[in-house]
């Protein structure tokens, strides 16, 4: 989860988020190298006398600055397309959870279980217990088994919402009349927080998401107690 004054990304909890962080570092290094080259050329132009002002063309230079950007774009595009494919691929999910956005709360339905559904509201600040996080705690957490592929079906009952959990690399729009899907896989147990990431009205900031990832046997006990 996030920490006060944190500058970097949240700790990766899913394979997708690990890939996204690696891609971020890869792209940032390319941007840093290009920026350094541009600053170096600008400094040369400002500190040296201009030469070859009468040159009309330079075939070698034009070839380089045509081919080099194309190579750089390919170096960025290939890993990006690979991650997009991974995010869209869902192989034999063990569980499907339907998520519906409302103004201003989330409702969840475990479609593999009969009558296992609930609404999830933010806990008001005055009702928080010591150690709980302001604007991030909910009355009903989404309990899911860890280390297993889970399919989330996401939609909305009213306006546009967005179901996002940064540490899992998840951000999927909840659109009325349309069913989007996402894959959830956690490498470790714990509580993972997110929020609605699409402005949806006056209480947009009060739609937190809390995923509780637990071992499979604990999830089975929880689901049995909820039915």
Swiss-Prot record:
Mitochondrial intermembrane side: 1-22, 82-227
Cofactor note: Binds a dinuclear copper A center per subunit.
Record's keyword terms, sorted: Copper, Electron transport, Magnesium, Membrane, Metal-binding, Mitochondrion, Mitochondrion inner membrane, Phosphoprotein, Respiratory chain, Translocase, Transmembrane, Transmembrane helix, Transport
Subcellular location field: Mitochondrion inner membrane
PROSITE patterns per record: COX2, COX2_CUA, COX2_TM
Binding site for Cu cation A2: 196, 198, 200, 204
Its membrane topology: Multi-pass membrane protein
One GO cellular component term: mitochondrion
Catalysed reactions listed for this entry: 4 Fe(II)-[cytochrome c] + O2 + 8 H(+)(in) = 4 Fe(III)-[cytochrome c] + 2 H2O + 4 H(+)(out)
Cofactor dependence: Cu cation
Source domain of life: Eukaryota
Keyword Cell inner membrane: no
Biological role: Component of the cytochrome c oxidase, the last enzyme in the mitochondrial electron transport chain which drives oxidative phosphorylation. The respiratory chain contains 3 multisubunit complexes succinate dehydrogenase (complex II, CII), ubiquinol-cytochrome c oxidoreductase (cytochrome b-c1 complex, complex III, CIII) and cytochrome c oxidase (complex IV, CIV), that cooperate to transfer electrons derived from NADH and succinate to molecular oxygen, creating an electrochemical gradient over the inner membrane that drives transmembrane transport and the ATP synthase.
Subunit architecture: Component of the cytochrome c oxidase (complex IV, CIV), a multisubunit enzyme composed of 14 subunits. The complex is composed of a catalytic core of 3 subunits MT-CO1, MT-CO2 and MT-CO3, encoded in the mitochondrial DNA, and 11 supernumerary subunits COX4I, COX5A, COX5B, COX6A, COX6B, COX6C, COX7A, COX7B, COX7C, COX8 and NDUFA4, which are encoded in the nuclear genome.
Protein name: Cytochrome c oxidase subunit 2
Originating species: Mus musculus (Mouse)
Gene label: Mtco2
């Amino acid at each position: 989860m996030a920490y006060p004054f944190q500058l970097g990304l949240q700790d990766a909890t899913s394979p997708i988020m690990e890939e996204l962080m690696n891609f971020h570092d890869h792209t940032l290094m390319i941007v840093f190298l290009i920026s350094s080259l541009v600053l170096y050329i600008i400094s040369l132009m400002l500190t040296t006398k201009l030469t070859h002002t009468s040159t009309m063309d330079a075939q070698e230079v034009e070839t380089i600055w045509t081919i080099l950007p194309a190579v750089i774009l390919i170096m960025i595009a290939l890993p990006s397309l690979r991650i997009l494919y991974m995010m869209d691929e869902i192989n034999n999910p063990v569980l499907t959870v339907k998520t519906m956005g409302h103004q201003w709360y989330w409702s969840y339905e475990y479609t593999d279980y009969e009558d296992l559904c609930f609404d999830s509201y933010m806990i008001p600040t005055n009702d928080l217990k010591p150690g709980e996080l302001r604007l991030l705690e909910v009355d009903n957490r989404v309990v899911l088994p860890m280390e297993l592929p889970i399919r989330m079906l996401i939609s909305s009952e009213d306006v546009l919402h967005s179901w996002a959990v940064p540490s899992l690399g998840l951000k999927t729009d909840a659109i009325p009349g349309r069913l989007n899907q996402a894959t959830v896989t956690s490498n470790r147990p714990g509580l993972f927080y997110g929020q609605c990431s699409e402005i949806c009205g006056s209480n947009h900031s009060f739609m937190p998401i809390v995923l509780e990832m637990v071992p499979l046997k604990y999830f089975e006990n929880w689901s049995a107690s909820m039915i």
